[in-house]
């Protein structure tokens, strides 16, 4: 089954996810879905990211149902960063951002993005894991980046598509996954709901 309808719901406020989906030719209606993003005891980064993507999709679908909106696929995603078993979410403040960037300096870490699509009773999840290798960062570079304000709404305190791109020596995996929505996995998921991309 394929569909000519390019409309989906997006349970995310991320401008990067919106931009990626629009570049794929999709038309989006944003759904606000709040969930508790606390890490559970013993939960690893992949399990955590997949759970949050699934819970965001479920919460978004409840909004669609309770508001009587037309049924169409709803996409949600979650991104986290992990290094040596530690989960790095969005920094709480400048000190937290500084701690994260120092941890990544001269080392690799993983950017993990899980994507969930829900339509009716069907919910599917796919995950992208990318190894990101940072150059060694000077204190001055870290301070300039923090002063830019860019780290504060991003998992791991950086955005690869922004000023922090200069910190990245190379990646092994999905660039769009590090941005917050892996195009390959997203297209595979949407194909399961009848979308033919591109």
Curated annotation (Swiss-Prot):
InterPro entries: ITPase-like_fam, Maf-like. It comes from the Bacteria. GO terms for cellular component: cytoplasm. GO terms for molecular function: dTTP diphosphatase activity; UTP diphosphatase activity. It catalyses: dTTP + H2O = dTMP + diphosphate + H(+); UTP + H2O = UMP + diphosphate + H(+). The active site is at 78 (proton acceptor). Coiled coil: none annotated. Its cofactor is a divalent metal cation. GO terms for biological process: nucleotide metabolic process. The keyword Hydrolase applies. The keyword Signal does not apply. The record marks 16, 79, 161 as: Important for substrate specificity. Its EC number is 3.6.1.9. It is found in: Cytoplasm. Keywords: Cytoplasm, Hydrolase, Nucleotide metabolism. Disulfide bonds: none annotated. Its main location: cytoplasm. Nucleoside triphosphate pyrophosphatase that hydrolyzes dTTP and UTP. May have a dual role in cell division arrest and in preventing the incorporation of modified nucleotides into cellular nucleic acids. Belongs to the Maf family. YhdE subfamily. This is dTTP/UTP pyrophosphatase. It comes from Chromobacterium violaceum (strain ATCC 12472 / DSM 30191 / JCM 1249 / CCUG 213 / NBRC 12614 / NCIMB 9131 / NCTC 9757 / MK).
